[in-house]
Amino acid sequence: MRFDQSETFTAGYLLPPAAYDADNTPASFDNGTAQACTIALQVGAGGITFSGTNKVEFKLTHSDAESSGFEAVTIDDVVGVESVGAGGIVRALTAAHATPSVTLIGYKGRKRYLRLLADFAGTHGTATPMAATALRGKLDRIAPA
């Protein structure tokens, strides 16, 4: 038997779907009282050939306040990535990216608000399609102290 899970989570954008060629202005995402959050980072075929100079770094930050106090996440705050770079880098595009991809990043930190910056470096003459959707789950549970 299959079960419907659509009522067990809610979703919102950390990075609205668009073709980007420069940094986005991150909006605060309210994780509310959810006890789980998974970020689906979607990147289309690269508009350019990425390199160590012409790159995009996705930086995840979190805070207890909606508009201030944002700090970079660390490896202790996320699952699904091998490492977290300086400034909260959870994914970096530094080589050719010809095939669209989805990277799932589990947030297990204890902060209420999240922001995701697509930090562009170098020259990006052609935009790259991308988006990041946050899925809030375990809405009916209370976190342990």
What name fits each language-model region?
Residues 1-16, 51, 120-145:
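C-terminal interaction-tip segments
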Residues 19-31, 99-102:
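Short beta-strands within extracellular/lumenal beta-sheet-rich domains
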Residues 26-44:
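Contiguous beta-strand segments within globular domains
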Residues 35-41, 107-125:
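Noncatalytic modules at the cell exterior or secretory-pathway interfaces
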Residues 42, 59-66, 119:
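Predominantly extracellular/luminal cell-surface or secreted proteins
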Residues 51-58:
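Short coil-to-beta strand junction motifs in C2/discoidin
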Residues 71-80:
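Beta-propeller fold detector
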Residues 79-106:
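Extended, solvent-exposed segments with strong compositional bias
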